[in-house]
């Protein structure tokens, strides 16, 4: 909404005092820039169109809402949707009295503007007089004419300050910085805004005016020209004003309508003026078409130039790319060619493969030989120790040395003076060319002609690559001829031609009638504009008044209907908005609920999958731990059994050795005693006693010993499989050795047993 403040005459409308509306919000209070119903009461409040007037009415209705909230005591503290805390009802109290018109004031202005335009087109029409209310300059409105303009940035300065001579003030040292900086009383702050000056430009101000009676100012005929649409005026606007003046002069020269004798002259003048206007309109249309055609040609030309430029860029890029590829391939081929030629030359130097002795004199005489330039691929690097020969100079390797060396240089080295060369004089004092200059010019022309002739290439017309077909012109159609065989056919042909003429004329008449029926309203309008009789004028005026009354009645009815529709639409809109808001929130809630449910299901599924995977991993880990525990137990058990068996064997062997030693000692003692007793008994025994001793030895010693040996062998054979299994688990690779040892032990035991049996038998035989 645009607020334009102009000075108008106060209209006779009832003023209703209103206080400035204060709009309160949750954040705090806010004072609006205008009152709610200023568009109805304030004569200085102007809107640009009926749309803005309707918008202001809607805003006032929304601000002063007539909907009232009535609390429900049963569900006053409820937050549920189906148990609302309050209900809405429409208040019957209207802040605007019924006698205040809510229509837009612009209709009256449009009606007044239409009357003004009618006065410019029809000189016979008299504009109704406007009665202005007394401004009461000497009465109650006198104070308005003593108000001076307020200039916010204007400040009157005394003349002694304006014309004072500026004096140079002595320099004063700034004071020492204190602990706290002084805060200036005023500060200038710059701001930047997104708005431009063009966004706030309005039409220039035009003051109010009063038209004198029986006068039509020429300036009012230019009311259609506005700023940016005809203003500032150009050549076209000046020509339009001149044509309007000529037309007004022509209308003034027309004969009066009351003079019936000049009716034919008036009609001819109007026809001529109409033809001139149509001719001028055709010229304007042709000019516009030519301008549009030129603009179209220029656009097409620019588009073609841009397209050609883009195509040339693509072609140049493609050509440069192909050229680079070609040059790279050529360089590669050249390098390959040189390398191949060098290899062929090296091979052909000694085709027969003879061994030649080195010619030292030839090598040292040839500076291209390997003596002076050895090949690095053979392991020779002539510049390997080149750094040993680098000269280290203080004046060249250090900055101080360079500065000292530069200070020793003369000035013309560091500060050169460039002198412009003198121009070569090619003319004499008389103004003629010198002979040398003329000869140089002639030689340059001859050289240029020779170069042009040398570089000129005869363009050979290339034969076409494919066969081209020469177009054969189409033969012309033969001229039709009509041959009449008899007079009857000729008469029939003439009758047909005449019938065709009648049909064409009838068609033209029908087209004219249809055009007249289509443009009947325009014809009636032209007839009303150029009515000839006073009675018809009165009739037209009465019809016009009736039409205006009907229009006002229709506007009033439409305004009332629009108000009712606006209120109903507002109620429907609020109800639909609440309903749609509730439905949208429910839809969002259901969607969120479904989405959350889907997330829950997905999370539950992932949790189950992870639990299954974790349980599987846990079972596998437990199984692996059990297997490792069993393996560890078995290994420990085997180790313990091995150690216990090893210790047991050691203890048993020790016990056996100790017992054997003790037994041997005891046996030796007993043997000595027995030997003594035996010698004593041997000296005293008889044959029967000897037989009895042998039998007792056999039955009491030999047979129990053999039985004891067989029992031990059975026990050893029973334990042997367990020992073999333990040894196979621990020492699988020593199985063969153990087997050999066992077999050897068995053989030894068998041999020992056999030897014992043999000894026993020998002893028996000896006894």
UniProtKB/Swiss-Prot annotation:
Main localization (coarse): mitochondrion
InterPro entries to which the protein is assigned, alphabetical: CFAP91, CFAP91_dom
Keyword Electron transport in record: no
Post-translational modification as stated in the protein's UniProt record: Phosphorylated by PKA.
Signal peptide segment: none
Region (Disordered): 1-29
Protein origin, superkingdom: Eukaryota
Gene Ontology BP annotations: axonemal central apparatus assembly; cell differentiation; cilium movement; spermatogenesis
Subcellular location: Mitochondrion; Cytoplasm; Cytoplasm, Cytoskeleton, Cilium axoneme
Description of how the protein assembles with itself and partners: Interacts with MYCBP and AKAP1. Part of a complex containing MYCBP, AKAP1 and PRKAR2B. Interacts with CFAP61.
Protein name: Cilia- and flagella-associated protein 91
Gene name of the encoded protein: CFAP91
